[in-house]
Amino acid sequence: MRTDNNEHKALFTIPTAAHSSALANIKPLPEQRRITGHKQTDAYLWVLEVIRLNEPAHLDAAEAALEKIKISPKEAEERYSRYLLANGGDPFQVAFGTIGMDNPARAIKNAREGIKKAASVRATFGSYEAALEDVEAERVIKSSSKFIDDHLWGWTPAEKKAGSINGSRMNEIDEQRRAFVEGYRDVLPEPNTLSDVVREFVYWDWLYSVRHTATKEQGYEFGYSEHHESVYDRERYLEKLLETIKPVTRAEAIEVCRWFLESEKAQYMENDGAAVILNLVGECEE
C-alpha cells in the first residue's frame, strides 16, 4: 500500500514548542490623550487601545477599568463617530475607525486569543524575529536553479520601461512562471499521498498565521503581508496534485474532502475545485 513520503513529512510537519514563551519586555501603556474632549469617551478609547495591545500585564487592569467607565459602548461609539465626521472624516473612514467599539467583550476575547497565539510563536521560534527567518522548506526552494526572485520576471523591455502591465498580462506571466518552476519539485520532496499534500498546505497556512502574529506583535498594524511568490507557486502545484493523486483509502478520501471543504480553497480554483472532488469520490487503492 502506498504510504506517506517520510522526507516530505519531516520537512512540513509543524514543529513543537522548544523555547520559553516568557515575555522579555512588557509593552508600555499608551499615552492618555485628549481626543474628543469628552472625558468618558476619551477614557473608553484609551482602555480599548490598552486592550488591543495584547499585553498580558495590562489586560486584567484594562478589563477592570471598563467597569468603572460610566458611558455605554454604544454612546462612546456614537460620540466618536460624530467627532470623526466633524473633523473631516468620510463615512468609510468613520465606519473603519469605529469597528468593534460597541463590543468591548469581543475586544477582550480577541486580546486573550492574541496573547495565546503570541506565546505559541515565542515557544516555537524563541522570538518574533526568528519566526520571520526562512524555514528549511524556504531555504530548499531558494536552492533551486529555477528559483525566481525578480518581480519583473517575464516582462518585456517595453513593459519594464512603462513600469506597468495590465491584469491579463500579469496572469499570463504568472502562468509562465509557474510552468517554469514546476512547484520547485526539483528540490522539494514530492508528496506521495493526498495526506502529504494536505500536510504541506496546512504547514504554509500555519507559517503565515505565525508570521502574521509575530509582525503584529512587532508593531506592524496590518501584520504579515504575504509569503514570497515562490510559496504560492508551490501551492498552485499542490492544487494540481489534489486533482491527480488518488486516495489510498476511503478514510483518507473523506478526511481530505473534509479539509478541502473547510479550507475554502475551492473558491479560488477552476470550476470551484470540481476536479478535486471528482478525484476524491473516485476509486481508491484499498
Give the role of each language-model region.
Residues 1-141:
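Intrinsically disordered, low-structural-confidence terminal and linker regions
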Residues 167, 177-203:
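Short, charge/polar-rich alpha-helical segments
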Residues 229-286:
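Alpha-helical oligomerization segments
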